Design a protein with these regions (language model features):
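Short acidic/His/Gly/Ser-rich catalytic and metal-binding motifs that mark active-site loops
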Residues: 17-22, 169-172, 253-256, 319
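Active-site nucleotide/adenylate-binding loops and adjacent lid/helix of ATP-dependent enzymes
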Residues: 6-12, 76-80, 120-202, 207-210, ...
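Phosphate-binding site of ATP-dependent enzymes
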Residues: 3, 183-263, 267-278, 301, ...
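Alpha-helix N-cap recognition
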Residues: 68, 181-182, 332
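Hydrophobic beta-strand scaffold residues
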Residues: 61, 111-112, 140, 161, ...
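ATP-binding N-terminal substructure of ATP-dependent carboxylate-amine bond-forming enzymes
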Residues: 1-111, 118, 122-124, 147-153, ...
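ATP-dependent carboxylate activation and anion-phosphoryl transfer catalytic cores
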Residues: 132-137, 267-360
Length: 360
């Protein structure tokens, strides 16, 4: 691990549509409403856990908040941290601006953890990501993209289908109604997605099977796939689609949340684990992810592996899937955070050495 004591700024975003409410809550920055699961009473936030881990590692952590105002960007330009630990998901609540934040940090010449702007935008636009997967021979469900007034077909697809926003993450826009069985249901869902989220609708083959998550630590050249995590959907009521809906993931008071859980994937033979690992690594590299990331997959009953999407900056709370996988690999939470720091610092050091060599 990096031996030197580092000044590390935890960069995170907050937003509130009511500026008056924001002013009143300055001492307790609000999360985006759709991420409210992160602020469950008595549970530490991911940034608080990371802050404590950095202290245990001997570093000097601090918080840096992006609140959607230009002033916060100006303040970031004066940041003197040795490394930015990037936890941002949006700017002023706009998820499509996530890559802009990272691009801005790049322009400032600051070191930071996680994916660069290109990787974020490739992963965020699910239709583009799926085209890249297909180019690299990585299986992904056949799909079409519905824009207002036109549909862009990539393949012939058949029902049942799942319809979701092309740009959102965190299962936003995915509920029991997302799985459609006929043209009427499909068109109604497409219209709902376009109106509610102002986003193209991704129309995708619904793949029956197990929901498998592969956490990955490492660079493009050298990456380690952590033990597989399964979101067990088997106890969902009959007739309820076996999907990772928003309620399943975040709404603790719902029946579907209580009936599902993430756990170390069991009953996977070595060949299947290798196939899942190889697929996850291929997707990680295809989208140029780095330091850490998570690949969400479906394992079909016939053994086929389909990549559903990639998450370049997965949630790092200690009770969530990535940390769960790291723990199963033998890493404590503090060691996991230390590994991410080491990867980011090594990457920046190697880039500096390469630049210096090129100038000789």
């Amino acid at each position: 691990m990096i031996g030197a004591k580092l000044k590390i700024a935890l960069l995170y975003d907050v937003w509130n549509e009511d500026p008056v409410a924001t002013a009143k809550e300055e001492t307790t920055p609000p999360h985006k409403p759709r991420k409210k699961v992160k602020t469950v009473k008595k549970e530490k936030t991911d940034r608080e856990e990371i802050f404590e881990a950095l202290q245990k590692l001997g570093h000097e952590p601090s918080y840096f908040e992006l609140d959607g105002r230009p002033q916060s960007l100006h303040s970031l330009s004066r940041c003197d941290a040795d490394l930015i630990f990037n936890l941002t998901e949006s700017f002023d609540g706009d998820d499509t601006k996530e890559m802009n934040v990272v691009a801005y940090v790049d322009l400032l010449g600051l070191r930071y953890t996680g994916a660069g702007p290109h990787a974020i935008i490739l992963a965020q636009d699910k239709a583009i990501a799926k085209k890249i997967f297909a180019f690299h021979g990585i299986k992904t469900p056949f799909f079409a993209t519905a824009y207002r007034g036109r549909i862009e077909h990539a393949h012939d697809i058949s029902f049942p289908l799942i319809v979701k926003p092309s740009w959102e993450d965190g299962s936003i826009g995915i509920d029991a109604g997302a799985v459609v069985k006929n043209v009427k249901e499909m068109m109604e869902r497409v219209e709902y997605i376009q109106d509610e989220f102002d986003s193209p609708a991704l129309i995708e083959e619904y793949i029956e099977g197990r929901e498998i998550y592969a956490g990955i630590l490492g660079s493009y050249e050298r990456a380690e796939v952590l033990p597989m995590i399964e979101l067990d959907l088997s106890r969902l009521p009959e007739g309820t689609p076996k999907i990772a809906s928003y309620d399943v993931k975040f709404e603790k008071n719902t029946e579907v949340y209580k009936l599902t859980k993430s756990q170390i994937a069991e009953n996977l033979d070595e060949e299947t684990v290798n196939r899942l690992s190889d697929t996850a690594l291929a997707a990680y590299r295809a989208l140029k992810l780095r330091d850490y990331g998570r690949i969400d997959m479906r394992l079909a009953p016939n053994g086929d592996v389909y990549v559903i999407e990639a998450n370049p900056n997965p949630w790092l709370a200690s009770r969530q899937e990535f940390a769960m996988a790291a723990k199963a690999s033998g890493l404590s939470y503090t060691e996991m955070i230390g590994a991410i720091i080491d990867l980011a610092m090594s990457r920046h050091l190697n880039a500096n050495l390469a630049a210096a060599a090129a100038m000789r």
